[in-house]
Design a protein with these regions (language model features):
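Patatin-like phospholipase
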Residues: 1-37, 45-301
C-alpha cells in the first residue's frame, strides 16, 4: 500500500504541489493513502482527485487577503525584497476584542469550501482508501488524525482549515468542546502515522532543505522575533518527525522516499507571493524530475 505524505510549510506548499504533480501526472504513481499536516492537508483532497491543474491555479493565485480575514502582517517591498513587520492596527483591534491571536484566517475557511465541493468530497472518499489530516488538540495536549472516511463534508473542511491555523498569527478554533491549532505544532510530517495505517511504500515531501543548518535573520521587534522563534521550534519538531519516521520505516521494512527542498525557500511561510509560489511549483516539479532520472541512472549502473 503506497502513501503520499506532505509536511506543513505555508506558502511553500506550492513546491510540494510541483513535486506531487510530477509523481502523479508523469510517473503515474497511484496512492492509496494521503496524509498531511498544515499546508499538506490543503493539498491532499485535490491530489487524491487528480485535480492538478485546479490545484496549481489555487496555489499560484492566492494572496494575503485570500488567507487572512484580519492580517497580522505588513509587507513592504524594497529592491525586489520583502520585509515583514507587525500590523499594529489589526493587532490592537484583536486586543480590544480580547482575542488571543494577532490575526484571523476565516477567509481561508471560505477558500477551502469554495474550491472543494461536497460532490468532490464524496468522490475523494471513493478514490482513496484514506485521506488523513493532522491537527493539534491544545486542550488535551495531543496530536489527532482526522480521516475523511470518518467525517462529514462540513467537518472535514473544518479539520483541513484547523490543520493550517498557525496560532497565534491565525485563528484559534474551538470544536467539539476543545481548542485546536495547526497540526504542525505536534507532527509536521506524519510518516510514522502512515506506517501505522499500513503503508508499505511512502513518498514524503518535506518542505525544508535536507541540511536545516542556516543562519536566520532574527526580527528587530518582539513580534518578528516571535515569528523566528516559532520557525525554530517547528524545525526541531520536523527533525524529530523525520528521524522517528526513518526508524519506523526501518523497523517495519517500509520503503521511504524523501523529497526535500534544494534550499531555504523563505524565512516567513505566512507571506503569500504569487510570483514566488509559481516559481516554487516549477522548482518542485524539476526537483522530482531530476530525482527520478538519478534513480533511473543508478538502476542502469
Amino acid at each position: 500500500m503506497r502513501a503520499l505524505v506532505i509536511s506543513g510549510g505555508g506558502s511553500k506548499g506550492a513546491y510540494a504541489g510541483g513535486v506531487a504533480h510530477y509523481l502523479i501526472r508523469h510517473q503515474h504513481t497511484k496512492y492509496d493513502l494521503f496524509l498531511g499536516s498544515s499546508t499538506g492537508s490543503l493539498l491532499l483532497p485535490h491530489l487524491a482527485l487528480g485535480n492538478l491543474n485546479k490545484l496549481y491555479n489555487i496555489y499560484t493565485n492566492v494572496n494575503q487577503n485570500s488567507i487572512f480575514s484580519l492580517n497580522p502582517f505588513r509587507v513592504k517591498r524594497k529592491d525586489n525584497r520583502e520585509f515583514v513587520s507587525i500590523n499594529y492596527v489589526n493587532s490592537l483591534l484583536q486586543f480590544i476584542k480580547r482575542k488571543r491571536t494577532f490575526g484571523e484566517s476565516k477567509n481561508l475557511r471560505q477558500l477551502i469550501r469554495k474550491n472543494f465541493s461536497e460532490a468532490e468530497f464524496q468522490k475523494a472518499r471513493t478514490n482513496a482508501k484514506d485521506i488523513v489530516v493532522t491537527v493539534s488538540n491544545l486542550t488535551k495536549n495531543k496530536v489527532e488524525y482526522k480521516s475523511i472516511q470518518e467525517c462529514t463534508y462540513n467537518d472535514f473542511c473544518e479539520w483541513i482549515w484547523i490543520s493550517c491555523n498557525y496560532v497565534p498569527f491565525m485563528s484559534l478554533v474551538e470544536k467539539d468542546g476543545f481548542e485546536y491549532a495547526d497540526g504542525g505544532f505536534g507532527c509536521l510530517i506524519p510518516i510514522r502515522e502512515a506506517i501505522r495505517r499500513g503503508a508499505t511504500e511512502i513518498d514524503a515531501i518535506i518542505l525544508e532543505s535536507e541540511n536545516m543548518e542556516h543562519n536566520k535573520i532574527l526580527g528587530k521587534n518582539p513580534f518578528s522575533l516571535m515569528v523566528g522563534l516559532f520557525s525554530f521550534m517547528m524545525d526541531q519538531t520536523e527533525r524529530h518527525n523525520i528521524v522517528e519516521g526513518k526508524l519506523a520505516a526501518i523497523n517495519k521494512e517500509v520503503t521511504l522516499n524523501l523529497y526535500y527542498t534544494p534550499s531555504k525557500l523563505t524565512e516567513n511561510s505566512l507571506i503569500f507571493n504569487k510570483k514566488l509560489m509559481r516559481s516554487w511549483w516549477k522548482q518542485g516539479y524539476a526537483y522530482a524530475e531530476r530525482k527520478a532520472q538519478q534513480a533511473k541512472d543508478n538502476e542502469l549502473k
